[in-house]
Amino acid sequence: MPTITSYFGFLLAALTITSALFIGLSKIRLI
């Protein structure tokens, strides 16, 4: 269980960082 939980936590963090970077690039392109 701990391995699965940490895996999902890492996946969620990676997804959040990726979406944040994508939004940042989109805002830069809009400017």
From Swiss-Prot:
InterPro entries: Cyt_b6/f_cplx_su6
Keywords tagged on the record: Chloroplast, Electron transport, Membrane, Photosynthesis, Plastid, Thylakoid, Transmembrane, Transmembrane helix, Transport
GO MF term (any one): electron transporter, transferring electrons within cytochrome b6/f complex of photosystem II activity
GO biological process, one term: photosynthesis
Membrane topology value: Single-pass membrane protein
GO cellular component terms given for this protein: chloroplast thylakoid membrane; cytochrome b6f complex
Pfam families to which the protein is assigned, alphabetical: PetL
Annotated transmembrane regions: 4-24
Predominant cellular place of this UniProt entry's protein: plastid
SUPFAM superfamilies with a match to the protein in the record: PetL subunit of the cytochrome b6f complex
Compartments (UniProt record): Plastid, Chloroplast thylakoid membrane
Family assignment from sequence similarity: Belongs to the PetL family.
Subunit composition and interactions: The 4 large subunits of the cytochrome b6-f complex are cytochrome b6, subunit IV (17 kDa polypeptide, PetD), cytochrome f and the Rieske protein, while the 4 small subunits are PetG, PetL, PetM and PetN. The complex functions as a dimer.
Biological role stated in the UniProt entry: Component of the cytochrome b6-f complex, which mediates electron transfer between photosystem II (PSII) and photosystem I (PSI), cyclic electron flow around PSI, and state transitions. PetL is important for photoautotrophic growth as well as for electron transfer efficiency and stability of the cytochrome b6-f complex.
Protein name, entry field: Cytochrome b6-f complex subunit 6
Gene designation per UniProt: petL
